[in-house]
């Protein structure tokens, strides 16, 4: 036994971390506090005046002098100074987790362990949401903090009014993240000692840990929340995954906005990027930085993806309301500032028909600009829906004309996706360039130098303006670095190979997905059990299916019941409308542009593997009918492409067994699909 009587040093080759003479004095203050509001060695922390520690915390620009927060810190500082005696290591208070837009109460580095500690002041029980929260913090460090990839992380939840601990067990998952320990205050020290006794390994390099890069890949909802809360600039840098690409592009767009404002210019920018590079993130950054209605450079992000707009607006509105309540302020009834800078493009377009006035926004961002309608599609819509005959503009022409009503200056930012099929009635990005060339010579064009690539289908149109006045090609308007999910970078290639019936390529790509589990099953209950087991913390899981999957009803999957994407994506585990309940299935229309961590992809007879290729079907009346139109076949194939690429961390594919007694669901409709997927190498759940 060690002289301190706490640790059996024979079991710990790295020595006793309770009474050893290890020193962290050589860690510079800059490193210590780079991600935390306060950082010091445990010895320095214990000897410091509590008022001086509180003063350092209160100096942070994000500090909010809420009475409850102040009281919590005072209590936590006193508690930690008392309970960390004879322990050596590093301590951080209010450690920032940018992806989640929040901070960990305490991070402790002792021996081979990173302890992630969260207090729930005044709580007598261990709420599931609180357990998930501290678990999420540990998972975030494990996945995105480089020096935490190979270390043991132990989350500890302290309910300050609890009388008994809920869980003192040490249970680790394969990646070294332990299940949260749930303790009352008197059990905190024992939990630390128990973990140090039972977790072996080399001591942490505490300097390296402090210096290590944090490289998160946020979902679009997480990114929007952080950008809105932090007003853009700093938050977007946190998401840059160690690359300068996003920051450089965002800075260039800000320069063009300022130049247009100062010099009374009208500018249209075309931003390109590889799939998953963060084009929408840049658009959100512009919109959130210029979100205030009284800002002369007020901006709006426009998207034709209705569910995406609804989910983003609801997420930001909920966060803003929570922030106000935390500060003791009451949200204004009926007020929704988020609506001012994230809108559906069709609502924006409709405003242009109401009067001759310019839009309220001088900066307008069009997401997926290549999906704007052609002149024929726009004219047909205007005639049928708006009673406007003989409409002569394409949607790009009409939208530019609306923004051009500003007499002084304006900026349009077109976010351009490449490599995507142009659907019926969509004009492609070339229509925007052509509209400026033919109708708006007073507008200058700043074009990504990559817009000439074949995947953007604009080469011919770009050629007509290449030497024109007021046309500038800019390398900084291309995002070259993918920010796809940390586990899912090869998933799109795998799905493409599966859908293109390239078996060998699919097998090879599947072998690269060693951190992205994929399974198939004929049993829906097994699929549900699988995602519930795989998910940790608040990782979201959900049930998804094709909008043409009409014969999953015997499995209680009825896609005709419209799922509300706001509740499905944002609500918690106790809400029956949330994805967690695995009762409501979302279709490709509700999930496009959004993600879950774990998905159950339900496969129906609308898209069947047959022989050496796919068979396409639409359920009409009481039977399946063949889909012969090539365009509609492509829609169906792309629906499954969307479904199979929605999960960030893994998925299980549910292929029903069918029913010989049901002519709409014979086993033959499903067996060949299941066999094809199994032959590729996807593991089978039995």
Description of each model-found segment:
Residues 271:
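Hydrophobic anchor at the beta1->P-loop junction of P-loop NTPases
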Residues 411, 581-686:
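C-terminal accessory regions
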Residues 238-267:
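N-terminal pre-P-loop "Q-motif" helix
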Residues 283, 453-464, 475-595, 599-605:
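Conserved helicase/translocase motor-coupling segment
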Residues 91-102, 333-355, 547, 572-606:
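Conserved helicase core region in the C-terminal RecA-like lobe
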Residues 279:
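Conserved lysine of the Walker
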Residues 2-217:
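Accessory nucleic-acid engagement/destabilization modules that flank
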Residues 334-403, 583-586:
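Conserved RecA-like ASCE ATPase "motif II neighborhood" in helicase/translocase motors
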């Amino acid at each position: 036994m060690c002289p301190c009587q706490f640790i059996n040093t024979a079991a710990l080759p790295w020595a006793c971390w309770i009474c050893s003479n290890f020193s962290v004095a050589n860690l510079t203050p800059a490193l210590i506090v780079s991600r935390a509001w306060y950082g010091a060695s445990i010895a320095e922390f214990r000897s410091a005046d509590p008022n001086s520690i509180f003063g350092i915390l209160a100096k942070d620009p994000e500090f909010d002098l809420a009475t409850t927060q102040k009281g919590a810190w005072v209590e936590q500082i006193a508690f930690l100074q008392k309970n960390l005696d004879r322990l050596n290591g590093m301590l951080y208070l209010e450690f920032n987790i940018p992806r989640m837009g929040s901070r960990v109460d305490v991070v402790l580095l002792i021996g081979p362990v990173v302890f992630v500690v969260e207090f729930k002041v005044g709580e007598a029980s261990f709420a599931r949401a609180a357990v998930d929260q501290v678990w999420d913090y540990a998972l975030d460090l494990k996945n995105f903090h480089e020096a935490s990839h190979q270390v043991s992380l132990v989350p500890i939840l302290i309910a300050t009014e609890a009388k008994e601990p809920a869980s003192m067990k040490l249970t680790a998952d394969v990646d070294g993240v332990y299940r949260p320990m749930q303790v009352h205050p008197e059990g905190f020290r024992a939990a630390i000692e128990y973990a140090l006794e039972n977790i072996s390994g080399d001591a942490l390099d505490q300097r390296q840990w402090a210096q290590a890069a944090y490289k998160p890949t946020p979902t679009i909802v997480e990114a929007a929340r952080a950008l809105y809360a932090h007003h853009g600039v700093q938050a977007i840098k946190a998401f840059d995954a160690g690359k300068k690409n996003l920051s450089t592009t965002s800075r260039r767009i800000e320069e063009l906005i300022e130049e247009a404002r100062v010099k009374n210019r009208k500018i249209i920018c075309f931003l390109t990027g590889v799939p998953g590079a963060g084009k929408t993130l840049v658009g959100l950054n512009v919109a959130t930085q210029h979100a205030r209605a009284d800002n002369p450079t007020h901006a709006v992000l426009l998207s034709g993806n209705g569910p995406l707009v609804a989910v983003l607006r609801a997420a930001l509105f909920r966060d803003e309301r929570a922030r106000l309540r935390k500060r003791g302020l009451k949200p204004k009834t009926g007020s929704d500032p988020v609506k001012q800078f994230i809108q559906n493009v069709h609502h924006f377009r409709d405003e242009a028909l109401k009067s001759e006035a310019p839009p309220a926004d001088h900066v307008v961002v069009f997401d997926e600009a290549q999906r704007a309608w052609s002149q024929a599609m726009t004219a047909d819509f205007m005639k049928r829906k708006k009673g406007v005959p003989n409409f002569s503009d394409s949607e790009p022409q009409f939208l530019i004309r609306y923004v051009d009503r500003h007499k002084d200056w304006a900026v349009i930012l077109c976010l351009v996706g490449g490599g995507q099929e142009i659907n019926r009635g969509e004009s492609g990005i070339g229509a925007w360039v052509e509209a400026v060339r033919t109708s708006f010579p007073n507008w200058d064009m700043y074009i990504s130098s990559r817009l000439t690539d074949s995947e953007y289908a604009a080469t011919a149109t770009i050629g007509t303006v290449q030497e024109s006045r007021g046309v500038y090609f800019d390398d900084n308007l291309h995002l070259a670095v993918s920010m796809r999910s940390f586990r899912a970078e090869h998933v799109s290639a795998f799905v493409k190979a599966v859908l293109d019936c390239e078996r060998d390529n699919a097998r090879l790509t599947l072998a690269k997905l060693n951190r992205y589990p994929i399974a198939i099953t004929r049993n829906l209950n097994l699929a549900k059990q699988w995602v519930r087991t795989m998910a940790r913390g608040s990782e979201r899981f959900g049930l998804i299916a094709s909008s043409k999957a009409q014969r999953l009803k015997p499995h209680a999957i009825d896609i005709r019941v419209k799922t509300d994407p706001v509740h499905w994506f944002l609500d918690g585990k106790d809400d029956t409308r949330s994805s967690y309940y695995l009762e409501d299935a979302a279709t490709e229309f509700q999930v496009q542009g959004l993600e879950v961590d774990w998905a159950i992809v339900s496969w129906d007879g609308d898209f069947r593997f047959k022989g050496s290729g796919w068979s396409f079907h639409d359920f009409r009346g009481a039977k399946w009918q063949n889909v012969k139109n090539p365009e509609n076949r492509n829609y169906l194939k792309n629906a499954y492409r969307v479904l199979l690429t929605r999960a960030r961390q893994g998925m299980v594919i549910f292929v029903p067994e069918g029913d010989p007694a049901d002519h709409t669901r014979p086993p033959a409709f499903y067996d060949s699909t299941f066999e094809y997927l199994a032959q590729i190498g996807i593991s089978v759940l039995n």
